[in-house]
Regions:
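Phosphate-coordinating loops and pocket residues in cytosolic domains that bind phosphorylated ligands
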Residues: 61
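DNA major-groove recognition helix of helix-turn-helix/homeodomain DNA-binding modules
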Residues: 44-58
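Residues in the helix-turn-helix
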Residues: 18, 29, 58
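Recognition helix of helix-turn-helix/homeodomain-like DNA-binding domains
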Residues: 25-38
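Short amphipathic helical patch at the helix-1/turn junction of helix-turn-helix
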Residues: 10, 38-39
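Short basic helix-loop element that most often maps to the first helix and adjoining turn
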Residues: 3-22
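Short, Lys/Arg-enriched C-terminal cap helix and immediately downstream tail that follows
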Residues: 8, 42-43
Length: 65
């Protein structure tokens, strides 16, 4: 799964720690999501999409392999 979390975080001029704080998760969680090493829960994905004013589908794209 690919995502635009890093791009959208930069657009809002947020650090990983600031984004993590807004979402009540650790900075390491944000780092892992950005590096595609961790897929967020549905609840976290929805929170992120709302924060970035995107749909979940726009923020997270499933590889069609």
């Amino acid at each position: 799964m690919k995502n635009l979390v890093k791009v959208e975080r930069a657009r809002l001029d947020l650090t990983q720690a600031e984004l993590a704080n807004k979402l009540s998760v650790s900075r390491q969680t944000i780092h892992a999501i950005e590096k595609n090493k961790f897929n967020p829960s549905v609840v976290l994905a929805i929170k992120m999409a709302k924060l970035f004013k995107l749909s979940v589908e726009e923020l997270f794209k499933i590889d069609e392999d």
